[in-house]
Every structure is written in C-alpha cells, then in structure tokens.
A protein has these predicted regions:
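Active-/binding-site microenvironments in catalytic and ligand-binding cores
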Residues: 2-329
Length: 329
C-alpha cells in the first residue's frame, strides 16, 4: 500500500490481482474521481514539484502536425482535409473534414478500449459509450488538464550506445529489463504521478521512409514498442505512473509477442496490453508523440525530467484526442 498527500491509500498490483470477481486486476472504485483514472496520482504537491523541473525555460511541443502520418500505420485513419473559406475580402475561416482524433500525436481515453473479460473501466455499461454521453470521455482531462512531472527514458539512445539499435522494421519488442536499464543509465528515479515518456526513435524513423515503404510497413502490421508482460503492467502501477506515452504507433509492440499473458483475456486485441491499462487500471496512453527534439535537448543538458502539460480537446465523450502536450525544461 502507498498513500498520496491527500491521504488516499492505493494497493500494490499484487493486491489488485487479489480483489474479488470482476475487480481482480483493476483499479475500479479506487480513485476519488471515477472517470479520471491514474492522472489522479498527480496531487497539488506533485504539480508544485514539477515546476522545479523548469531549469532552462525551453519549451517543446510534443505533437506532430495533424496530417503528419499520411500514410500512417492505421488501416482506417487518414489525414484530415483542411479548408479555408471567406465570407468577404476581410474574412478568413476554416474547418477540417475527415479528422480522426487519434490520427497523429494523441492520448487514448478510457473509453478507447473495452476489456473483453470485464467490460469498460469502472464497469461502465456498454450502452453508455456512445456519442453524446460523458462517461469516461476525454473531456475530464480537458476540463482539468493533466499537468505534472514528465520523465523521459531514452531507450533509443541507450540501445545505440550499446551497439544494438532498435530494429523498427521488424517491430522489435522492448522488454521491461531494457527500459529499466535505460532509466538506470540516466540515473532516473520515478515518483508517484510521473508522466512516463519512452523515446524509441520510431516516429522519426517512420516519417523518414518513402511513401511506398511506409505503406509496406503499415501492411506488415509491425511496429516496435513495449513488450507485453504482466511484469510491465505491475511495474507501471506500482510506480504510480499517471500516463505512459511513446513516440511510436501503439506504445506497445505490434504484433503482440507470442508469449503475451493477455491472449486469453484480450482475444479481440490478440493479447495487447491496451485493455489492461485503459479498461482495468484507468491508465491513459500517449501515442505518436514527438519526443526526438526533447530527448536530444535532455541528453545535452543531462536532465531527464520536465514540466509536462496534456490538454485534450474538450469533446464530450471522445474516445481519444490530440494530446496537445507541452514539455518545459
């Protein structure tokens, strides 16, 4: 058990697994704001402490352009079409058509995934997850943005230093031991409420490919990312992470590793961890973040934390949103 500055006590992941019935392995009912999820780990004191991460006053936008991934890895999402129009010579206005809210840098909301075995987060009925309803929508994080200490683990840099660069074309799984080793090489210590950013180098690698090779990579359904394991899920919860974000397609690797322990409980996702994080723990995931410039700056300064803000679009009931994330070092 660990407690926050508000006095709220949270069990270990092992204890979560020992909860009864549908509650086993979930954080359902543990947070004061039922729809906020693990960003609840960020307390006012955490935000004040995060302000101490501002040392150089350098600001980084962590979102790629809305049309950056065209083509991208998604079989469905396309780049939006931007139209500018005028009512008279002194006026300009604009709109977007075909805007997929998770088509570029994004944050996955808690209604983005339903656990095959127990349903949506907090037992929210399936019928409540539709347009025009608020339950589990990203508007919760728009009305009270996620602001806290962001820590960047440069797995890409660590692997290069070891002489074993990540094989993005093969969709290399990145295991917990590797992520821990990279964090230890940076002398990183995690705190409750941290926003974890994992720099893999995947986005910059993918965006540098010719269009035809991007399409081939999309069709291969391979993307490097975190290896699926019960150990990683436990580690994320026990470190009280508020958000996990990465500069790759799905945070976790695709396809899921054959040994994924979630193949039986997440058959529709072929053993991905998305259901564990979103539907069971209430832990939002950030995907396709622009972390390269921030990582290079942090390496140059030797400081691997920053004040990070995440302000999704205020769309009631959205399943996800552009992350609208900023880091200040």
């Amino acid at each position: 058990m660990t407690s926050t500055e508000s006095g709220t006590t949270y069990p270990s992941y092992k204890a979560l697994l020992e909860r009864e019935g549908q509650l086993a392995g979930t954080s359902w009912g543990l947070f004061p704001d039922a729809g906020r999820g693990t960003p609840s780990f960020i307390q006012p004191g955490s935000v004040r402490d995060a302000a101490g991460c501002v040392r150089t006053g350098t600001v980084f936008g962590l979102d790629y352009p809305a049309d950056a991934f065209d083509p991208g890895m998604s079989l469905k999402r396309r780049a939006p079409r931007h139209t500018i129009y005028s009512a008279h010579p002194a006026h300009r206005d604009d709109f977007l058509d075909g805007y997929y809210l998770q088509g570029s840098s994004q944050i996955d909301g808690l209604r983005h995934r339903r656990a095959d075995d127990v349903g949506f987060y907090n037992g929210t009925p399936d019928g409540d997850i539709r347009e025009g309803t608020a339950a589990l929508g990203v508007q919760v994080w728009a009305e009270q943005p996620i602001v806290g200490r962001g820590v960047l683990v440069d797995v890409d840099g660590y692997c290069r230093d070891q002489g074993t660069p990540i094989d993005h074309a093969a969709g290399q799984p990145l295991g917990l031991n590797l992520i821990r080793a990279a964090a230890e090489a940076q002398s990183l210590a995690f705190r409750p409420g941290d926003i974890l950013m994992i720099h893999t180098g995947w986005c910059e690698w993918f965006l540098a490919l010719p269009a035809g090779e991007k399409e081939s990579q999309r069709d291969s359904r391979r993307a490097s990312g975190i290896e699926q394991s019960a150990e990683f899920v436990a580690w994320a919860w026990d470190n009280r992470l508020a958000v996990i974000a990465a500069d790759n397609f799905a945070v976790e690797c695709l396809p899921p590793v054959p040994a994924s322990p979630f193949r039986a409980t997440a058959p529709n996702d072929h053993g991905m961890m998305h259901q564990q994080f979103l539907a069971k723990l209430g832990l939002p995931l950030g995907e396709l973040w622009q972390l390269g410039p921030l990582s290079r700056h942090m390496k140059a300064t030797g400081s691997w934390d920053a004040l990070v803000t995440i302000k999704p679009l205020n769309i009631t009931g959205a399943t996800g949103s552009p992350a609208n994330a900023t880091a200040v070092t």
